[in-house]
A protein has these predicted regions:
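Acidic, low-complexity proline/glycine-rich segments
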Residues: 1-24, 267-269, 274-279, 311, ...
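Amphipathic, small/basic residue-rich leader segments at the start of a protein or domain
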Residues: 1-123, 147, 573-593
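Alpha-helix capping/hinge segments and adjacent helical runs
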Residues: 4-5, 188, 258, 382-462, ...
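Glycine-rich cofactor-pocket loops
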Residues: 28-31, 61-74, 285-296, 310-348, ...
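Internal maturation/activation junctions in enzymes
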Residues: 128-129, 140-181, 362-381, 388, ...
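A short core secondary-structure module
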Residues: 186, 190-244
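A glycine-rich, basic-preceded beta-loop-alpha segment at the flavin cofactor/substrate interface
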Residues: 195-197, 233-250, 255, 262-293, ...
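C-terminal amphipathic alpha-helical interaction region
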Residues: 452, 468-593
Length: 593
């Protein structure tokens, strides 16, 4: 089965669901219009299909190699990366003053969905560079911006994020890497970092590492962390490359999936480094990079799910087994069995919902930066903050579920590596873990995003959902009316659960209900956005016989309403159960000796 970039679906989601065209009214994106969007998606899809996708299987089977103290990339990866960088794809949304194209982040994110779908392991390299660009643009000095940003934007150099240490995973307060002043305004880094994605490779001239470390006398815990820039090769004042820095990979991990992406242990042996931002502000500064990465990881969940779905659908159309319950035909296509079609519909509905959630988050990010006035920017900022943990966690959970369902559609053949279905599942499984586990995303949502300011964001969201419900009702379309009823019921349930959690912020009861609440809110967001798509598609119903794709958008939204939104009461019950039996379930009750 040949993977195809979902250009049409992305175009529809951008234009009709998240309404990216409204960004043109801000005046912040000169030259951005419908034609530009279509051209970028078409060209990005072609690059993904023709250059990146053919290397996906080799990346899994061969994988990155560690030889003689350095990482060697999968054959063909370097050439493909150069095609990506030379085409200007690395700088789609970067500022023009640094060599970027200044396009909306939402459009760049759509392109990255196609990149990740074509080759998730390779796509991780430029993905992390995007985060480094964000961090330096926001927190770097003028000199750092001048020296590093043009080459990161062009893709000549790549970037990484160095947080994790053997004793400090999600608990970054425990990190031990030290930064010693060397007397001339720079620093020497000493320590070990693990799980560093694309920490070393042979695809670019230099690698810019953003590293969390502690200065002498820094406060204990997370308040004493600073961010530093340490390049693989030192950079002279004129931008030319100098000698190798005192840092190197000591090994790469053998992983369940994304074999083509080297996951390195990095050793810093008094490596030369520069402070980025203020001392002891490193964790806050790194969150600029992490938030960008979290949204990208959410899109990875969408991307790998889309690829798995396409293969499962192709298999279900070709494979014949048993008698159809609908037509009586024997042998019948797998697609003609109700439960197989149910699985495929659930996959499709969740993919479209997750895609819309991620793109809506990116549009909010664009408006937070470029809104016409302070009030508009603040409203968008609150929405971005509310949506980001949901985009990351809900979409990657969906990615794992969908790749598992895709394997199930294949039956026993899905469990055989040769079909490729297993790779999708293995690759998808990391996404709920890295860039902040999904449990941490849920805690962030409940602990930080339901406060006084962000409580406003939830109310604003529910008001928008309510407006969509009214449009569905006024359509006088029975299918849209049915969606409205499910959406209204789910909205009421979410409001009740939100009120319950808000009254218990900071309590263990709220933390115990965090993960089901994120699922509940994500389901509502997905159902709302699909309903917006259904409203847009309804305008084309006269053409549905000629092009059933439009009717399909309504069918997907209706299926989501009946099969996902309908679960709201049960999920809400789990949210509001609080600690319950958890407090009485100690190690012994769990079977520990």
């Amino acid at each position: 089965m040949t993977w195809r970039a979902p250009v049409r679906d992305l175009n529809f989601a951008l234009n009709e669901i998240v309404e990216i065209g409204s960004l043109a009214d801000t005046g912040a994106f000169p030259g951005f219009d419908d034609e530009t969007l279509a051209a970028v998606l078409d060209a990005g899809g072609k690059l993904a299909e023709d250059v990146l996708a053919p290397l996906n299987r080799a990346g899994d089977e061969i994988g990155a190699q560690y030889e003689n103290g350095a990482v060697r990339s999968v054959p063909g990866f370097a050439h493909a990366y150069r095609a990506f960088a030379d085409g200007g794809w690395n700088g789609l949304s970067a500022q023009t003053e640094h060599g970027g194209q200044g396009l909306p982040k939402a459009l760049a994110l759509a392109v990255f969905e196609m990149v990740h779908g074509s080759n998730m392991a390779l796509g991780l390299c430029p993905m992390l560079t995007q985060g480094a660009i964000e961090a330096l643009t926001t927190h770097g000095t003028d000199r750092q911006k001048q020296l590093y940003l043009p080459r990161l934007v062009s893709g000549e150099w790549t970037g990484t994020m160095n947080l994790t240490e053997p004793q400090a995973g999600s608990d970054l307060a425990a990190l031990r890497t030290r930064a010693e002043p060397d007397g001339n305004g720079t620093y020497r880094l000493t320590g070990q970092k693990i799980f560093i994605t694309w920490g070393d490779h042979d695809m670019a001239d230099n690698i810019v590492h953003l590293v969390l470390a502690r200065l002498p006398g820094a406060p204990e815990g997370s308040k004493g962390i600073s961010m530093f820039l340490a390049a693989k090769r030192l950079v002279n004042d004129d931008g030319s490359l100098g000698v190798a820095n005192d840092l190197a990979p000591s090994r790469i991990e053998h992983k369940l999936g994304i074999h083509g992406s080297p996951t390195c242990t990095m050793i810093y042996n008094a490596a030369h480094a520069e402070l980025v931002g203020a001392a002891n502000d490193g964790l806050a500064n790194m969150f600029t990079m992490m938030n960008a990465a979290r949204l990208q990881v959410g899109v990875q969940g969408v991307a790998i799910a889309e690829r798995a779905y396409q293969q499962a659908l192709s298999f279900a159309l070709e494979r014949k087994q048993g008698r159809s319950a609908w037509t009586g035909e024997y042998p019948a296509r797998l697609l003609d069995h109700p439960d197989v079609r149910r699985m495929l519909m659930l996959m499709k509905a969740k993919i479209e919902a997750a895609r819309a959630i991620c793109l809506a988050t990116a549009v909010a990010t664009d408006f937070a930066l470029a809104g016409k006035d302070k009030a508009a920017r603040e409203r968008a900022r609150l929405r971005e903050e509310l949506f980001t943990p949901v985009a990351k966690a809900w979409s990657t959970d969906a990615g794992v579920e969908i790749t598992s369902l895709a394997l199930q559609v294949h039956g026993g053949m899905g469990y055989i590596e040769e079909t490729g279905a297993a790779q999708h599942y293995r690759d998808a499984r990391i996404a709920p873990i890295y860039e902040g586990t999904n449990g941490i995303q849920a805690i962030d949502l409940v602990g930080r995003k339901l406060g006084p300011g962000n409580g406003e964001a939830v109310r604003d969201l529910l008001a928008d959902v309510g407006a969509t419900i009214e449009l569905l009702r006024s359509s006088r379309n029975d299918r849209l009316g049915a969606i409205a009823r499910r959406l209204e019921a789910a909205t009421t349930t979410v409001a009740e659960a939100t009120e319950w959690l808000t009254a218990r912020r900071g309590q263990v009861d709220a933390l115990a209900g965090a993960t089901p609440y994120l699922e509940l809110l994500g389901n509502l967001m997905g159902g709302w956005l699909l309903a917006k798509g259904a409203l847009a598609a309804a305008k084309h119903l006269a053409d549905a016989d000629k092009n059933p794709w439009w009717s399909g958008r309504i069918g997907v939204a209706g299926f989501f309403a009946e099969h996902v939104l309908a679960r709201a009461p049960g999920i809400a019950a789990a949210v509001m159960a609080g600690v319950g039996d958890l407090s009485d379930t100690g190690p012994e009750a769990l079977g520990a000796n």
